[in-house]
Amino acid sequence: MDASTPLPPASSSPRCNPAPQTIHIEFPHHSSSLLESLNRHRLEGKFCDVSLLVQGRELRAHKAVLAAASPYFHDKLLLGDAPRLTLPNVIEADAFEGLLQLIYSGSLHLPLDALPAHLLVASGLQMWQVVDRCSEILRELETSGGISAGGRASSLTLISTTSSGGWCIRSSPFQNPVRSSASTENSVLPESPAGGEGSELEGMLQIQVKVEEEEEQGSAAPLFQTPQPERVSGGVSQACGSHPLPTPALPSKPSEDESSTVDPPAPPVQASQILYVNQENVECKEEIARGTKEKTKVLSGEDSEEKEELRYLLSSGGGESSGAGDPSWKPVDLHGNEILSGDGGPGGTGQAMHGPVKLGGTPPADGKCFACLCGKRFAVKPKRDRHIMLTFSLRPFGCGICNKRFKLKHHLTEHMKTHARALHACPHCGRRFRVQAFFLRHRDLCKGQGWPTYHWTYK
């Protein structure tokens, strides 16, 4: 056998090749050590690829870390990968630097009065875990009385937990222990003093977390809150300054002084059956331009059944118009024309008044919901409008050539055929148009080409 000839591969048997064994290696503190190294690089200015300008202060960071921690930075860097980012002026530099430290280290130590600023910045950066945790801290402090205790809870520390995947609160060594969040759900907010630094700070904190608390109060309101009239109770505390404290959603028991001053509820009064008649007006824009006020007609149910007459009341409370004198306003039809009745009507003395009427209450059984002031009712609105126009000889459709007016649109269409020979004719091709705008458009496009009887061609 030649030495250059390759040897055939040896046949492998299942007995010679055992199944491969896998080894699982885990480092529990790898993420924390990695964050610590990244934070050290940030502080030393190593491998930083973005500069953040906040109120004239420049901070260096890593794009990958910012994009992973904040959806705001993720979208901003995705749209424009710029080496320098300028944040809005509403973001405080100290609060942003604290949140940047929280992103890299997973913990944050801050004074209590700086918590609203950090909450505002976290909301702007869309760091919702931090927003939720800060809101929970504020609720726990309010429940435990840590805010109104004269500044005893002066500092807080936010740390991250790998087990829960969020943020948790750790009290300072000189801070009173706070109650768990589970106990705050069934507890009632205590009253705080009306003056002092504690109440002012509480008002500031309540304003900053107003958006977050509204969502939770909306979900908890159907469980605890009962429908009550809006009133300011004497037992609810008010913060000093121009920022009032929001009242708690939980119902509170009124005090003895309050119960003595509050009037007892009035007995229920049976509402009278009144049908509201609202006049419809097509040309409402012209009415508003003229400065006219909206008129409201009220149709009493009892009078309509017994006497079948209408009483017109002014919406401003001017009183009821008498039948002998002229009313202070004139009823109008769909097109803004004055409705004439009595001696001035086109039909002579005693002619019924016409106008669109909107019936309130339950719809009639026959389905005729569109009524006229004369008493007739129609199933569809066009028939009611046609009835009013024909009764008053309204002619809203006018001819633009001879200034004749017609009651219905198809009458105007038939009338336009009489002007077929006198309409606009193209001097180049001889084509005639009824509308001047169409004629002008055609004249600009026509180049003298003839128009055959079987085909029209546009250029």
From Swiss-Prot:
InterPro entries: BTB/POZ_dom, SKP1/BTB/POZ_sf, Znf_C2H2_sf, Znf_C2H2_type, ZnFinger_BTB_dom_contain. There is a cross-link at K285, K293, K368 (Glycyl lysine isopeptide (Lys-Gly) (interchain with G-Cter in SUMO2)). The keyword DNA-binding applies. Keywords: DNA-binding, Isopeptide bond, Metal-binding, Nucleus, Repeat, Transcription, Transcription regulation, Ubl conjugation, Zinc, Zinc-finger. SUPFAM superfamilies: beta-beta-alpha zinc fingers, POZ domain. One of its GO terms (molecular function) is zinc ion binding. One of its GO terms (cellular component) is nucleus. It comes from the Eukaryota. Residues 178-200, 212-274, 293-356 are annotated as: Disordered. Its main location: nucleus. The keyword Cell cycle does not apply. Residues 178-189 have a biased composition (Polar residues). A zinc finger (C2H2-type) spans 397-419, 424-446. Residues 48-112 form the BTB domain. It is found in: Nucleus. May be involved in transcriptional regulation. PANTHER family: AGAP004733-PA, ZINC FINGER AND BTB DOMAIN-CONTAINING PROTEIN 9. This is Zinc finger and BTB domain-containing protein 9. The gene is Zbtb9.
